[in-house]
């Protein structure tokens, strides 16, 4: 079975972009030979133009979702994540985002607490479903796994644009890079709180959560860190999550976010 390994640099500089872009070009040439079909660079450029427009429209939708109640479920964010990673360069997906923009305008103003979610969404977990599925008091307005790259891409240099997008993805490099990007997202959407779900075994998420907490503390945004299994419901312990989440939401409702939120995190061993 043919296998291709892309060596993605951590450094964000022109030499790194050139290095990865050349790998992508070599991979494209290999695909041409494997499939017996010529590569059409103009189609790639067209897809990048659509991707740029889709990303802008998605941020427009996120801003509207921070203003209006838009009934949905936690799993909806995972569907959106799949679309952003598998269909972002297609006109059909851009049309879907534009439809959602017009649709959300018909819904009432949201008066509850706005949540920015970080990392995996355990959509099957009972307590999380209770508080975030079609709940007019608490609404997840966006998740970092949906828009893990915020770069405007240059369609005139498609391979370099793709290389730069990969290098600047929030999951590449140190966690401080992710913390800065989440901070930019928070500055745009103005959430009332951030919740990060640390999946068991994901050392990057667990180890870097303190860096993100410090970043958000500087922005006066309370943060809750939850631990659990984001994939296998057999390892889901609803009681612990229920206790910590309800205490955090009660703190948000009381309007004393930063001080009590810090105490809550310290009490949980974070």
Report the location of each language-model feature.
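Flexible inter-domain linker/hinge segments
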Residues: 267-270
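Trp/Phe/Arg-rich N-terminal binding region typifying the photolyase-homology
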Residues: 1-41, 143-265
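A charged, amphipathic alpha-helical module
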Residues: 21, 25, 29-152, 171
